[in-house]
Regions:
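Sec-dependent N-terminal signal peptides
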Residues: 4-13
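Low-complexity, intrinsically disordered regions enriched in charged/polar residues
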Residues: 11, 81, 124-125, 215
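C-terminal segment of classical bacterial N-terminal signal peptides
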Residues: 14-18
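Acidic, serine/threonine-rich low-complexity disordered tracts
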Residues: 19-107, 138-225
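Hydrophobic, well-structured mid-protein blocks that either form specific transmembrane helices
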Residues: 92-132
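Alpha-helical transmembrane spans
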Residues: 132, 136-138
């Protein structure tokens, strides 16, 4: 029987630890991006400790071509900063088919809320929100996430689908399989969250992400350093 994640979280001690602790020994995580099983780009996260801050930088680039002509492209640069387990700032700039999107976020300690200036949302958000990036396994805990492209706040549900073994780049992983989807079923299709996620609990790493939108898209974990 499928079980919702809220049950799993009570039982799994790994989820209860500060998430930055899991990544302090990594310098980067590299994911390759595929569409219909053809590589189209990559998403790279780098991790750095500076005094009391934990800093995560992301570069994501991909390009979809049809008959040699680029029909869709993404170029993203973003930086997350944490003190302990608390996100204190996030900034990103995205060019989607040359259209600019952005997010400037800070944590207001007095209000204990995020203040967001984004291309699609300007306002406050609860501090329990996380940035919707695939390096962070806490995306499987939260009820809401902040779009790393535009700053919009999205409500989500998580469903546990089962345990599996998968193989990527000649490596085999024991994973837990989840579905992440929008809470509001009435959202337009292009605004809905609908992802399948394969998570390695022992390593506290998301191994693969897949979704369908005019084809099958996948983010596959290639390298950890």
């Amino acid at each position: 029987m499928r079980k919702f994640l809220v049950i799993l979280l009570v039982l799994s001690p790994l989820f209860l630890l500060a998430h930055t602790d899991h990544y302090k020994n990594y310098s980067n995580i590299e994911m390759e991006i595929f569409k219909d099983d053809e590589k189209i780009g990559e998403s790279i996260f780098t991790f750095k400790k500076e005094e009391n801050k934990f800093i995560v930088k992301n570069t994501t680039n991909f390009e979809v071509k049809l008959l040699g002509v680029t029909v869709f492209s993404i170029n993203i640069r973003g930086t997350e900063e944490y003190i302990g387990d608390q996100l204190i700032s996030f900034n990103s700039e995205t060019f989607q088919n040359n259209k600019r999107k952005y997010v400037n976020l800070i944590f207001d300690e007095k209000k204990e809320k995020f203040i967001i200036d984004g291309s699609s949302y300007k306002g406050e958000a609860d501090k329990e929100n996380i940035i919707g990036h695939w390096w962070n396994h806490r995306i499987l805990q939260t009820e809401t996430q902040i779009s790393p492209l535009s700053g919009s706040v999205k409500r989500q549900n998580i469903e546990f689908l089962g345990k599996e073994k998968i193989k990527l780049y000649n490596k085999e992983y024991d994973v837990e399989h989840f579905r992440l989807f929008s809470t509001d079923p009435n959202l337009p299709d292009n605004k809905k969250l609908n992802f399948e996620i394969w998570y390695d609990k022992k390593k506290a790493l998301i191994i693969k992400v897949a979704y369908k939108r005019m084809g099958l898209w996948e983010y596959r974990l290639k390298k950890i350093q």
